[in-house]
Amino acid sequence: MIFGTVPLAEAEGAILAHSLRASTGKIPKGSYLTAADLTALAQAGFEAVTVARLEANDQHEDAAALALAQALVSDEAGQNIRISGAGAGRVNLYARSCGIVRLDPHALNAVNAADPMITIATVPDYHRVDRDGMLATIKIISYGVPETALWQAGAGASGSIWVQPPVYKSATLIETKVTDETPPDKGRRAMGGRLQRMGLDLSPRVIVPHREADLADALTKAPGEVLLILTGSATSDPADVAPSALRQAGGTVTRFGMPVDPGNLLFLGDFGEKPVIGLPGCARSPALNGADWVLERVLCAEPVTGADISAMGVGGLLKEIPTRPMPRAKA
């Protein structure tokens, strides 16, 4: 691409680099200059303009952005992604359903390394997205790029971004109580909102005494495909009431504790084919906490190993909820 300032007499057919006010009105940047445009610019007192001209092997910014998007998303249905139209060198990628965004960072870094004028910016890996939520934007910075650079950027990029949708339809939240009083429904409302935005229904309310036998019985009778436990007393050890109840019911505990705050006291396990999440007390708040990161992956059938949870510590210091009984600074 050739870029620079030229006399008006040499500018016809070139791409205007900066918006200008002519005698007939504003000529937007990116416009292909016509003879009429040049006459209007001359009438406005311009003698020269800054323009770009594409060379034989260049791709226009819009065509380049769309071509790269199609290279990245070669299967819109399979990758669960919708490609937008192109404009001003930009194409956006949108989720076709709710879910979590999965990325191949190595492949995407290679896209951005091909040429400084060719860029893609994405949300983080495992980011929760709603239907029609934007998950990436492709921007060609210059008015055109060489076809060779565009080919290099797209090579190996196919399938490097996709949206994993939820696979479950229902969940049961089992709450325990430490007194005869019914717990406030704050936690149920917060969890119901989390499940609803991922397309899951919450089964009727279940409240049992904070005892292993009662909780184990509730787990065996729970109708949901995903089982959630919110205890009236914090779970502070792998041998505490809730993890022990899961084992007593015939389930397994695969992980207790996570390096995300708020969210440290989460535990993860399974009961037959059903995933089980022991929720930390912060799940009663709709604010982001460690349980969200685990819940969203579980609902989308993404494996969550102990190593995965251990890796959440970097970036795991989240905003403290206002109602926290013991704020960090006072501990």
Predicted feature residues:
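Phosphate-binding glycine-rich loops and their immediate beta-loop-alpha structural context
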Residues: 131, 141-228
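Residue-level "contact hotspot" at macromolecular interaction interfaces
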Residues: 26, 32, 125-128, 259
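Short, low-complexity N-terminal leaders and the immediately following helix N-cap/first helix
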Residues: 1-88
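Generic secondary-structure signature for well-ordered alpha-helical cores
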Residues: 43-47, 70-77, 131-134, 140, ...
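Extended, charged alpha/beta regions that create polyanion-binding interfaces
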Residues: 55-166
